[in-house]
Amino acid sequence: MVGRATRVAGLALLLLATSCTSGSVSPSPSASGRPTGATHLQLIEAEDAQTLDPALIDDPTSLAIGNEIFAGLTRLDANQRPVPGLAERWEIGDAGRTYTFHLRNAHYQSGATVQAQDALSAWTRALAPQMNSPLTIFFSPLGARYPGDSITGVQAVDSTTLRVQLPQANSELLTLLALPPYWLIDPKQPTAGAGPYHLDKWERGRALQLSAYTGYWGSSPSVRKVDIEIEPDNTKRLDRFTSGGADIAHGFGGSQLLAFARDPQRAAELHRVPNTRATWLGFNTVAGSGYGPTDRMALAQAIDRARVTDLALFGSMLAVPATDLLPPGVPGHLARQLPGYDPAAAKTALDAASFPSRLDLYFSTNATVGRVATDLQDQISTATGRTVVLHPTGDFFNQAALDKLPFFIDTWSADIPYPSDILENVIRANSQFNNLRLFDPAIESALDQGRAATTWDDALKAYQQAEMVALSQNRLIPLYSGVEPYLVRSGLRVPFVGGAIAFHWEDVR
């Protein structure tokens, strides 16, 4: 998997945080003299939104802004659990294959009333070939995957009732409905959403201005105005924040953040928010069949996760040691008891098993994972007395294509804050991205149960069981979970959620 090996290309690399794009700055007033609470929020971003069309959004800045302008049938609460959005309630029937949504009385920013038919119109629009949407795969629960595919199981029963019939049960649907391309739009004015804020002005590459929508169906936001400045230069962006010109800033490199955190007067302004990125060591069941259970446990004991994130990830500024394959930014994460660091036990076990004197380690993606690979090469070599040969990124993909990838570092960044996004891709048999070539009937059964579950709790329990089976075999060894650092001015309370969307403007106090 290359960086963003999931269904929306490029997002993981953007989340890793350093932008090199050029652009100009829109001046914004100094923050001095502003009250400690927030009625006017000033944000500074490294990159502009690429689009604010719900059918096309596939970058983090567009997602964060679009989430404030538009709304779906559901929304995600502080635990990323789907709760009522434009649908005030719903029923699930036919063993999870039929959903009936009852819409609340809500209006778009154009003044038009939200109607059930609008959902079908918005989703059909996103699937239209001329839209060239990169998000059509998200409609797979509805039986559509590609541009031009039709949706046959969605029916507007009346103006406030929408019935969705799925080809097969899929518990991911309620989470998907809170994200693009499922957001509803006014069919006559596609730029008008039903979210808490509307766009007042957009100077491309410079700034955006938004204000609270007075007709919003939810609680009235205390933040009434939001200004977003675009500053690609990391140093200038940090200067804007430290001089009081911005309330919230992010998108910085690890070295900058490390220096910032070492300033005792500034450290409290740094917040590391869990995202959806997971990184692990894996053993291919075919090419890596020579690694037995004892060998895999020994290699797990040869790794100090805290050292990995400290040395390779700038003092854990960009990640934290993993306690699970599912990162904290994805529902279902558990603080599991993973094999602990014990280099002496690792060497003893490998020596007793007459383990070979050489290991070949492959890694995917980018420079960050490359630093991790270099540190793991040193750790494993020092702990076990073996020579660890580190192969370049190109070898990873060549060997993966030939199914000859024995021992490797892999990573996944989920588009959807739901366990299936990671587990269905990483440990489901025959998945394109299952570089483990793992097949276990117990895993398959648990994944099937998670997909077919009709309640949130039952789904998470099943997915956690599937993961437990994979981890108990040490076929994969979780290394670290990603975090997205944010700088927040003192006195401002930001209830960070994490996952795909770090926080909501309307929750800032």
Over which residues does each language-model region extend?
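N-terminal lobe/hinge region of extracytoplasmic solute-binding protein
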Residues: 44-94, 124, 192-193
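Surface-exposed binding/hinge segments that line
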Residues: 100, 118, 134-186
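Gly/Pro-rich hinge or "lid" segments in bacterial periplasmic/extracellular proteins
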Residues: 160, 166-221, 225-227, 235
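Periplasmic-binding protein-like
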Residues: 286-329, 371-372, 467-475
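Ligand-site clamp/hinge motif
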Residues: 214-259
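Structural transition elements
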Residues: 317-352, 366-371
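Long beta-strand-rich cores associated with HINT superfamily self-processing modules
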Residues: 486-509
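Extracytoplasmic/peripheral linker and loop segments enriched in polar/acidic and small residues
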Residues: 154-155, 386-398, 422-490
